[in-house]
């Protein structure tokens, strides 16, 4: 049998927990809404087309729908988290300087991807792989203080796939199955370059 004091304590605890749960639910919903609004501003139509094409080529190359979805989801999550950190001024001066280098490296990567497609006999999978791995290393340094080991794992999952020399060779094979995908990817990347979105 409980005393009145114990019962009122339990009731107060129940109320506190209920309110706490409600606040947590609100935060979760608000967090999703904020993430969704940021995602829609970050991932415009052109970016979305490029991501869709990356998904299609990855799915076709891996012959694994689940793995392709995971790689693209990890790419999107990484981009959004990076943007949230950047927009909320979470980076120190060193990280901001590294972020500027990273943006330039991604721009160089995009130009190289398109150039290798447009100019016959220039493709070099080792050059692309090296550029991708340089981007990976910079990204790890930028997010080191801010994101979890799980996020670093996502970065590795994305870059392990896209920097794989066999994948790149298959993608750029002029007689291979991926030629239409590469054309669409390069069209989208070119548009992003023209719009200064990359």
From Swiss-Prot:
GO biological process: apoptotic process; positive regulation of apoptotic process
Keywords: Apoptosis, Coiled coil, Cytoplasm
Tree of life domain: Eukaryota
Coiled-coil ranges per UniProt: 49-83
Subcellular location, record wording: Cytoplasm
One Pfam family hit: DUF758
InterPro entries assigned: TNFAIP8-like (IPR008477), TNFAIP8_sf (IPR038355)
Main subcellular location: cytoplasm
Position of the signal peptide: none
GO cellular component terms attached to this protein's record: cytoplasm
Gene Ontology molecular-function annotations: cysteine-type endopeptidase inhibitor activity involved in apoptotic process
Protein function: Acts as a negative mediator of apoptosis. Suppresses the TNF-mediated apoptosis by inhibiting caspase-8 activity but not the processing of procaspase-8, subsequently resulting in inhibition of BID cleavage and caspase-3 activation.
PANTHER family in the record: TUMOR NECROSIS FACTOR ALPHA-INDUCED PROTEIN 8, TUMOR NECROSIS FACTOR INDUCED PROTEIN
Family the UniProt entry places it in: Belongs to the TNFAIP8 family.
Name used for this protein in its record: Tumor necrosis factor alpha-induced protein 8
UniProt gene name: TNFAIP8
């Amino acid at each position: 049998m409980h005393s009145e004091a114990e019962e009122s304590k339990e009731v107060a605890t129940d109320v506190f927990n209920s309110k706490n749960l409600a606040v947590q639910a609100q935060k979760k919903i608000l967090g999703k809404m904020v993430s969704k609004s940021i995602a829609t501003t970050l991932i415009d139509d052109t970016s979305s087309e490029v991501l869709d094409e990356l998904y299609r080529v990855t799915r076709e190359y891996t012959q694994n729908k689940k793995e392709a979805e995971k790689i693209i989801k990890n790419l999107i999550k990484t981009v959004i988290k990076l943007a949230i950190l950047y927009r909320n001024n979470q980076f120190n001066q060193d990280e901001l300087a590294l972020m500027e280098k990273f943006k330039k490296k991604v721009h160089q990567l995009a130009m190289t991807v398109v150039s290798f497609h447009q100019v016959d006999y220039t493709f070099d999978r080792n050059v692309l792989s090296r550029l991708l791995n340089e981007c990976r290393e910079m990204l790890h340094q930028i997010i080191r203080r801010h994101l979890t080991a799980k996020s670093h794992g996502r970065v590795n999952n994305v870059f392990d796939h896209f920097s794989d020399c066999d994948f790149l060779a298959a993608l750029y094979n002029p007689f291979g199955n991926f030629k239409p995908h590469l054309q669409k990817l390069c069209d989208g990347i070119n548009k992003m370059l023209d719009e200064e979105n990359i």
